[in-house]
Protein backbone atom coordinates (compact mmCIF):
# COMPACT_ATOMS: atom_id res chain seq x y z
CA UNK A 1 0.00 0.00 0.00
CA UNK A 2 1.33 3.45 -0.91
CA UNK A 3 2.49 5.56 2.02
CA UNK A 4 1.33 9.17 2.02
CA UNK A 5 2.44 11.91 4.36
CA UNK A 6 1.03 15.41 4.62
CA UNK A 7 2.46 18.88 5.08
CA UNK A 8 1.04 22.22 6.23
CA UNK A 9 2.14 25.63 4.94
CA UNK A 10 1.75 29.16 6.22
CA UNK A 11 2.48 32.04 3.84
CA UNK A 12 2.28 35.77 4.48
CA UNK A 13 0.42 37.58 1.73
CA UNK A 14 1.16 41.12 0.62
CA UNK A 15 -0.04 43.55 3.26
CA UNK A 16 0.86 41.17 6.06
CA UNK A 17 -2.23 38.95 6.04
CA UNK A 18 -1.71 35.25 6.64
CA UNK A 19 -2.59 32.63 4.05
CA UNK A 20 -2.98 29.18 5.60
CA UNK A 21 -2.81 26.44 3.00
CA UNK A 22 -3.91 23.15 4.54
CA UNK A 23 -2.29 19.75 4.36
CA UNK A 24 -1.19 18.25 1.05
CA UNK A 25 -0.43 14.59 0.53
CA UNK A 26 3.23 13.82 -0.15
CA UNK A 27 4.93 11.04 -2.14
CA UNK A 28 2.07 11.16 -4.63
CA UNK A 29 2.69 9.82 -8.16
CA UNK A 30 3.10 12.57 -10.73
CA UNK A 31 0.91 11.96 -13.77
CA UNK A 32 2.59 13.17 -16.99
CA UNK A 33 0.47 15.12 -19.44
CA UNK A 34 0.59 17.21 -22.58
CA UNK A 35 -1.31 20.43 -23.10
CA UNK A 36 -2.75 20.87 -26.59
CA UNK A 37 -1.08 23.93 -28.16
CA UNK A 38 -3.08 26.75 -29.76
CA UNK A 39 -6.33 25.24 -28.56
CA UNK A 40 -8.72 28.17 -28.99
CA UNK A 41 -9.17 29.93 -32.33
CA UNK A 42 -11.15 33.13 -31.91
CA UNK A 43 -12.29 35.27 -34.84
CA UNK A 44 -10.47 38.53 -35.50
CA UNK A 45 -11.64 41.20 -33.09
CA UNK A 46 -13.09 38.77 -30.53
CA UNK A 47 -11.23 38.35 -27.25
CA UNK A 48 -11.50 36.30 -24.09
CA UNK A 49 -10.95 37.62 -20.59
CA UNK A 50 -10.83 35.61 -17.38
CA UNK A 51 -11.81 32.02 -18.18
CA UNK A 52 -14.17 31.19 -15.33
CA UNK A 53 -15.88 28.02 -16.53
CA UNK A 54 -15.40 25.30 -19.12
CA UNK A 55 -17.60 22.32 -20.03
CA UNK A 56 -17.84 19.78 -22.85
CA UNK A 57 -20.90 18.27 -24.52
CA UNK A 58 -21.47 14.81 -26.00
CA UNK A 59 -20.22 15.93 -29.43
CA UNK A 60 -16.87 17.03 -28.07
CA UNK A 61 -17.65 20.73 -28.33
CA UNK A 62 -16.69 22.85 -25.35
CA UNK A 63 -18.14 25.99 -23.81
CA UNK A 64 -16.24 28.78 -22.07
CA UNK A 65 -17.91 31.25 -19.69
CA UNK A 66 -15.66 34.30 -19.57
CA UNK A 67 -15.40 37.69 -17.91
CA UNK A 68 -14.28 40.30 -20.42
CA UNK A 69 -15.74 43.76 -21.01
CA UNK A 70 -19.01 41.86 -20.75
CA UNK A 71 -19.71 38.38 -19.43
CA UNK A 72 -19.87 36.10 -22.47
CA UNK A 73 -20.51 32.44 -23.29
CA UNK A 74 -18.57 30.97 -26.22
CA UNK A 75 -18.86 27.60 -27.95
CA UNK A 76 -15.94 25.88 -29.71
CA UNK A 77 -15.80 22.65 -31.71
CA UNK A 78 -13.52 19.67 -31.05
CA UNK A 79 -10.59 21.41 -32.73
CA UNK A 80 -11.07 24.62 -30.77
CA UNK A 81 -12.57 26.55 -33.68
CA UNK A 82 -15.08 29.20 -32.65
CA UNK A 83 -18.68 28.14 -33.32
CA UNK A 84 -20.85 30.86 -31.80
CA UNK A 85 -21.57 33.15 -28.90
CA UNK A 86 -24.62 32.18 -26.84
CA UNK A 87 -26.88 34.76 -25.24
CA UNK A 88 -25.03 38.01 -25.94
CA UNK A 89 -26.53 40.75 -23.80
CA UNK A 90 -28.45 38.26 -21.66
CA UNK A 91 -30.10 39.70 -18.54
CA UNK A 92 -28.69 36.72 -16.63
CA UNK A 93 -25.04 37.42 -17.54
CA UNK A 94 -23.13 39.83 -15.31
CA UNK A 95 -20.19 38.18 -13.52
CA UNK A 96 -19.40 34.71 -14.85
CA UNK A 97 -18.57 31.87 -12.47
CA UNK A 98 -19.26 28.43 -13.99
CA UNK A 99 -20.72 26.60 -16.97
CA UNK A 100 -21.77 22.93 -17.01
CA UNK A 101 -23.42 20.58 -19.52
CA UNK A 102 -25.90 17.96 -18.30
CA UNK A 103 -26.44 14.44 -19.76
CA UNK A 104 -29.01 15.79 -22.24
CA UNK A 105 -26.51 18.40 -23.51
CA UNK A 106 -28.41 21.25 -21.88
CA UNK A 107 -26.13 24.15 -21.00
CA UNK A 108 -26.17 25.55 -17.46
CA UNK A 109 -24.49 28.79 -16.46
CA UNK A 110 -23.90 29.95 -12.90
CA UNK A 111 -23.58 33.72 -12.64
CA UNK A 112 -22.17 35.14 -9.44
CA UNK A 113 -23.21 38.69 -10.31
CA UNK A 114 -26.90 38.09 -11.03
CA UNK A 115 -27.39 35.36 -8.38
CA UNK A 116 -28.77 33.06 -11.08
CA UNK A 117 -28.42 29.49 -12.28
CA UNK A 118 -29.73 29.33 -15.85
CA UNK A 119 -30.58 26.20 -17.83
CA UNK A 120 -30.54 26.47 -21.63
CA UNK A 121 -31.25 23.87 -24.28
CA UNK A 122 -28.50 23.01 -26.79
CA UNK A 123 -29.78 25.78 -29.05
CA UNK A 124 -29.25 28.31 -26.27
CA UNK A 125 -32.91 28.91 -25.36
CA UNK A 126 -33.64 29.40 -21.67
CA UNK A 127 -35.55 26.50 -20.07
CA UNK A 128 -35.24 27.26 -16.36
CA UNK A 129 -33.97 29.97 -14.03
CA UNK A 130 -33.13 29.41 -10.36
CA UNK A 131 -32.58 32.50 -8.26
CA UNK A 132 -33.41 36.17 -8.62
CA UNK A 133 -31.34 39.00 -10.04
CA UNK A 134 -31.23 42.11 -7.82
CA UNK A 135 -33.15 44.94 -9.49
CA UNK A 136 -31.03 47.76 -10.86
CA UNK A 137 -32.99 50.26 -8.77
CA UNK A 138 -31.84 48.44 -5.61
CA UNK A 139 -28.20 49.28 -6.30
CA UNK A 140 -25.21 47.23 -7.37
CA UNK A 141 -25.47 43.67 -8.56
CA UNK A 142 -24.32 40.94 -6.22
CA UNK A 143 -20.57 41.39 -6.57
CA UNK A 144 -18.32 41.52 -3.52
CA UNK A 145 -19.54 45.02 -2.68
CA UNK A 146 -23.16 44.43 -3.63
CA UNK A 147 -26.17 43.44 -1.53
CA UNK A 148 -26.18 40.05 0.19
CA UNK A 149 -29.20 37.90 -0.58
CA UNK A 150 -30.92 36.05 2.28
CA UNK A 151 -30.59 32.27 2.41
CA UNK A 152 -34.11 31.59 1.18
CA UNK A 153 -35.20 28.52 -0.76
CA UNK A 154 -35.10 30.16 -4.16
CA UNK A 155 -32.85 33.15 -3.57
CA UNK A 156 -29.15 32.58 -4.12
CA UNK A 157 -26.20 34.63 -2.88
CA UNK A 158 -23.28 34.66 -5.31
CA UNK A 159 -23.66 31.00 -6.35
CA UNK A 160 -20.65 29.14 -7.67
CA UNK A 161 -21.49 25.82 -9.38
CA UNK A 162 -24.20 23.30 -10.31
CA UNK A 163 -24.46 19.50 -10.72
CA UNK A 164 -27.13 16.78 -11.13
CA UNK A 165 -27.77 13.26 -9.91
CA UNK A 166 -28.97 10.37 -12.13
CA UNK A 167 -32.61 11.28 -11.39
CA UNK A 168 -32.10 14.83 -12.64
CA UNK A 169 -32.17 16.50 -9.21
CA UNK A 170 -30.20 19.74 -9.20
CA UNK A 171 -27.50 20.61 -6.66
CA UNK A 172 -26.24 24.20 -6.35
CA UNK A 173 -23.23 25.36 -4.36
CA UNK A 174 -24.56 28.68 -3.05
CA UNK A 175 -21.14 29.90 -2.22
CA UNK A 176 -19.88 33.35 -1.38
CA UNK A 177 -22.80 34.64 0.70
CA UNK A 178 -24.94 31.73 1.88
CA UNK A 179 -22.29 29.05 2.50
CA UNK A 180 -24.67 26.21 1.69
CA UNK A 181 -25.56 23.53 -0.83
CA UNK A 182 -29.16 23.42 -2.08
CA UNK A 183 -30.98 20.47 -3.66
CA UNK A 184 -33.86 21.04 -6.10
CA UNK A 185 -35.84 18.47 -8.05
CA UNK A 186 -35.58 18.33 -11.84
CA UNK A 187 -38.33 20.95 -12.13
CA UNK A 188 -36.57 23.39 -9.80
CA UNK A 189 -38.61 22.70 -6.65
CA UNK A 190 -36.68 23.08 -3.39
CA UNK A 191 -36.00 19.79 -1.59
CA UNK A 192 -33.22 20.26 0.97
CA UNK A 193 -30.12 22.18 1.94
CA UNK A 194 -27.01 21.81 4.09
CA UNK A 195 -24.95 24.66 5.54
CA UNK A 196 -26.04 28.16 6.50
CA UNK A 197 -25.35 31.85 5.92
CA UNK A 198 -22.74 31.82 8.67
CA UNK A 199 -19.47 30.25 7.58
CA UNK A 200 -18.15 27.41 9.73
CA UNK A 201 -15.74 24.49 9.69
CA UNK A 202 -17.93 21.74 11.14
CA UNK A 203 -18.83 18.60 9.15
CA UNK A 204 -22.03 20.14 7.78
CA UNK A 205 -20.74 23.70 7.45
CA UNK A 206 -18.92 25.50 4.66
CA UNK A 207 -16.64 28.45 4.17
CA UNK A 208 -17.09 29.25 0.49
CA UNK A 209 -18.40 26.09 -1.21
CA UNK A 210 -16.81 26.79 -4.59
CA UNK A 211 -17.46 23.70 -6.72
CA UNK A 212 -19.79 20.70 -6.77
CA UNK A 213 -20.13 17.30 -8.47
CA UNK A 214 -22.35 14.22 -8.10
CA UNK A 215 -21.43 10.58 -8.78
CA UNK A 216 -23.53 7.77 -10.28
CA UNK A 217 -24.78 6.72 -6.83
CA UNK A 218 -25.99 10.25 -6.11
CA UNK A 219 -23.29 11.16 -3.59
CA UNK A 220 -22.40 14.86 -3.60
CA UNK A 221 -18.82 16.22 -3.57
CA UNK A 222 -18.30 19.83 -2.50
CA UNK A 223 -15.11 21.87 -2.88
CA UNK A 224 -15.09 23.65 0.51
CA UNK A 225 -12.47 26.13 -0.57
CA UNK A 226 -11.76 28.32 2.46
CA UNK A 227 -11.89 25.30 4.78
CA UNK A 228 -9.10 23.66 2.73
CA UNK A 229 -11.04 20.45 2.14
CA UNK A 230 -13.52 18.52 0.04
CA UNK A 231 -16.72 17.33 1.77
CA UNK A 232 -18.86 14.36 0.71
CA UNK A 233 -22.61 14.01 1.35
CA UNK A 234 -25.20 11.42 0.45
CA UNK A 235 -28.07 12.25 -1.88
CA UNK A 236 -30.13 13.69 0.97
CA UNK A 237 -27.19 15.92 1.98
CA UNK A 238 -26.26 13.93 5.07
CA UNK A 239 -22.53 14.13 5.81
CA UNK A 240 -20.38 11.15 4.79
CA UNK A 241 -16.70 12.14 4.66
CA UNK A 242 -14.13 14.91 4.45
CA UNK A 243 -10.88 14.85 2.44
CA UNK A 244 -8.44 17.35 3.91
CA UNK A 245 -5.07 16.34 2.43
CA UNK A 246 -5.54 17.99 -0.97
CA UNK A 247 -4.84 21.64 -0.18
CA UNK A 248 -7.45 24.23 -1.07
CA UNK A 249 -10.19 22.56 -3.12
CA UNK A 250 -11.37 25.16 -5.63
CA UNK A 251 -13.17 22.94 -8.12
CA UNK A 252 -14.24 19.32 -8.36
CA UNK A 253 -15.50 16.99 -11.08
CA UNK A 254 -16.40 13.30 -11.33
CA UNK A 255 -15.77 11.42 -14.56
CA UNK A 256 -18.59 9.27 -16.02
CA UNK A 257 -18.38 5.59 -16.90
CA UNK A 258 -18.25 2.30 -14.97
CA UNK A 259 -15.14 3.37 -13.01
CA UNK A 260 -15.59 6.95 -11.89
CA UNK A 261 -12.71 9.15 -10.81
CA UNK A 262 -12.70 12.29 -8.69
CA UNK A 263 -10.61 15.31 -9.67
CA UNK A 264 -9.99 18.40 -7.55
CA UNK A 265 -7.68 21.39 -7.93
CA UNK A 266 -5.46 22.89 -5.23
CA UNK A 267 -5.44 26.17 -7.15
CA UNK A 268 -2.88 28.86 -6.43
CA UNK A 269 -4.61 31.89 -4.89
CA UNK A 270 -5.48 35.09 -6.74
CA UNK A 271 -2.65 37.59 -6.60
CA UNK A 272 0.15 35.01 -6.50
CA UNK A 273 1.73 36.15 -3.26
CA UNK A 274 5.37 35.11 -2.75
CA UNK A 275 5.65 31.55 -1.51
CA UNK A 276 2.24 30.34 -2.62
CA UNK A 277 3.41 28.73 -5.87
CA UNK A 278 5.52 26.19 -4.00
CA UNK A 279 2.48 24.85 -2.14
CA UNK A 280 -0.34 25.15 -4.67
CA UNK A 281 -1.26 24.67 -8.30
CA UNK A 282 -1.66 20.90 -8.73
CA UNK A 283 -4.74 18.85 -9.61
CA UNK A 284 -5.40 15.56 -7.81
CA UNK A 285 -6.87 12.41 -9.34
CA UNK A 286 -8.62 10.27 -6.73
CA UNK A 287 -10.90 7.33 -6.19
CA UNK A 288 -14.33 8.31 -4.92
CA UNK A 289 -13.37 7.06 -1.44
CA UNK A 290 -10.63 9.68 -1.24
CA UNK A 291 -7.68 7.47 -2.19
CA UNK A 292 -5.21 9.65 -4.07
CA UNK A 293 -4.04 8.05 -7.32
CA UNK A 294 -1.82 10.84 -8.57
CA UNK A 295 -1.50 14.52 -9.27
CA UNK A 296 -0.52 16.70 -12.19
CA UNK A 297 0.31 20.30 -12.95
CA UNK A 298 1.90 23.18 -11.08
CA UNK A 299 1.49 26.91 -10.58
CA UNK A 300 3.00 28.79 -13.52
CA UNK A 301 2.23 31.53 -16.00
CA UNK A 302 3.77 29.45 -18.78
CA UNK A 303 1.84 27.18 -21.14
CA UNK A 304 1.35 23.79 -19.48
CA UNK A 305 1.32 25.28 -15.99
CA UNK A 306 -1.74 26.66 -14.23
CA UNK A 307 -2.53 30.22 -13.24
CA UNK A 308 -5.45 29.90 -10.81
CA UNK A 309 -7.52 26.96 -12.09
CA UNK A 310 -11.13 27.98 -11.54
CA UNK A 311 -13.20 25.16 -13.04
CA UNK A 312 -12.53 21.96 -14.98
CA UNK A 313 -14.25 19.30 -17.05
CA UNK A 314 -13.45 15.57 -16.85
CA UNK A 315 -16.00 13.96 -19.21
CA UNK A 316 -13.02 11.86 -20.36
CA UNK A 317 -10.82 11.05 -17.34
CA UNK A 318 -7.71 11.22 -19.53
CA UNK A 319 -8.67 14.49 -21.22
CA UNK A 320 -9.11 17.31 -18.74
CA UNK A 321 -10.18 20.84 -19.65
CA UNK A 322 -9.17 23.58 -17.20
CA UNK A 323 -10.21 27.23 -17.16
CA UNK A 324 -7.78 29.70 -15.60
CA UNK A 325 -8.54 33.10 -14.13
CA UNK A 326 -5.25 34.96 -14.30
CA UNK A 327 -3.90 33.58 -17.58
CA UNK A 328 -7.20 34.22 -19.39
CA UNK A 329 -7.07 30.83 -21.06
CA UNK A 330 -8.44 27.30 -21.31
CA UNK A 331 -6.12 24.32 -21.58
CA UNK A 332 -6.89 20.82 -22.81
CA UNK A 333 -4.72 18.31 -20.96
CA UNK A 334 -3.97 14.82 -22.27
CA UNK A 335 -3.06 12.68 -19.26
CA UNK A 336 -0.71 9.68 -19.34
CA UNK A 337 -1.69 7.85 -16.14
CA UNK A 338 0.20 4.67 -17.03
CA UNK A 339 3.45 6.64 -16.94
CA UNK A 340 2.88 8.08 -13.45
CA UNK A 341 5.95 8.16 -11.22
CA UNK A 342 6.30 8.84 -7.51
CA UNK A 343 8.32 11.94 -6.69
CA UNK A 344 9.10 11.84 -2.97
CA UNK A 345 9.04 15.07 -1.05
CA UNK A 346 7.29 17.14 -3.71
Each language-model region and where it sits:
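Bacterial N-terminal signal peptides
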Residues: 5-16
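Eukaryotic scaffold repeat domains enriched in small/polar residues
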Residues: 21-346
Amino acid sequence: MRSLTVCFALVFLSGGSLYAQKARAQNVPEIPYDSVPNLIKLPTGLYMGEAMGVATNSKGHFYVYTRSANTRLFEFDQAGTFVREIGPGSYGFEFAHSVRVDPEDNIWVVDEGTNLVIKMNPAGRVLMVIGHRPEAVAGAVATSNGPAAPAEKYTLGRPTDVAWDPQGNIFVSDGYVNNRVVKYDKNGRFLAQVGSEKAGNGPTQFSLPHGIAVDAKGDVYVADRSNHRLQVFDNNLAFKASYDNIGDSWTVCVSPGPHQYLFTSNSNPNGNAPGTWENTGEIYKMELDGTILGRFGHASKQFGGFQVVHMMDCRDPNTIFVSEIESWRVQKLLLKPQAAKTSAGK
